[in-house]
């Protein structure tokens, strides 16, 4: 007997956050998909020229992905925060990790966090 959408929603509503994270990971594995947000194309023209002139960037953690522990370690290393503060920051994604950094520093931090499994944007 197939479950109705209502029954599925009720079952999901009863799960804890940790159980939901595990469920999402299982969906990603089974169907070979990613729950990461789709990047939106940047506007062309004048906005591109303004982006070239920008000298300071904000590093924003948009998602911690499947490997939250590795992302927390990378955030601690990059920011010098304690374990609890780094964990709260990661779990509260999207969050700005660093403000007013150079493009080089921002790209380096973005690379480290993405290697740990996070989704990061420079703004």
Curated annotation (Swiss-Prot):
Keyword Ribonucleoprotein tagged: yes
Pfam family, one: Ribosomal_L12
GO (cellular component) term, any one: cytosolic large ribosomal subunit
Source taxon at top rank: Bacteria
Gene Ontology molecular function: any one: mRNA binding
A biological-process GO annotation: translation
Alphabetically ordered keywords of this record: Ribonucleoprotein, Ribosomal protein
CDD domains, A to Z: Ribosomal_L7_L12
SUPFAM superfamilies attached to this UniProt entry: ClpS-like, Ribosomal protein L7/12, oligomerisation (N-terminal) domain
Protein function: Forms part of the ribosomal stalk which helps the ribosome interact with GTP-bound translation factors. Is thus essential for accurate translation.
Family: Belongs to the bacterial ribosomal protein bL12 family.
HAMAP family in alphabetical order: Ribosomal_bL12
Subunit note: Homodimer. Part of the ribosomal stalk of the 50S ribosomal subunit. Forms a multimeric L10(L12)X complex, where L10 forms an elongated spine to which 2 to 4 L12 dimers bind in a sequential fashion. Binds GTP-bound translation factors.
The name this protein goes by in its record: Large ribosomal subunit protein bL12
Naturally occurring in which organism (per UniProt): Acinetobacter baumannii (strain ATCC 17978 / DSM 105126 / CIP 53.77 / LMG 1025 / NCDC KC755 / 5377)
Gene name, Swiss-Prot/TrEMBL: rplL
């Amino acid at each position: 007997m197939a479950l109705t959408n209502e029954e599925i929603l009720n079952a999901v509503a009863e799960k804890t956050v940790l159980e939901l994270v595990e469920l999402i990971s299982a969906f990603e594995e089974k169907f070979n998909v990613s729950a990461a947000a789709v990047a939106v194309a940047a506007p062309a023209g004048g906005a591109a020229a303004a982006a070239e002139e920008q000298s300071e960037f904000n590093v924003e953690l948009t998602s911690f992905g499947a490997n939250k522990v590795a992302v927390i370690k990378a955030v601690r290393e990059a920011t010098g925060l304690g374990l609890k503060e780094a964990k709260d920051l990661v779990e509260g994604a999207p969050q700005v990790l660093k403000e007013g950094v150079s493009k080089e520093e921002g790209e380096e931090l973005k690379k480290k966090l993405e290697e740990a499994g996070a989704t990061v944007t420079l703004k």
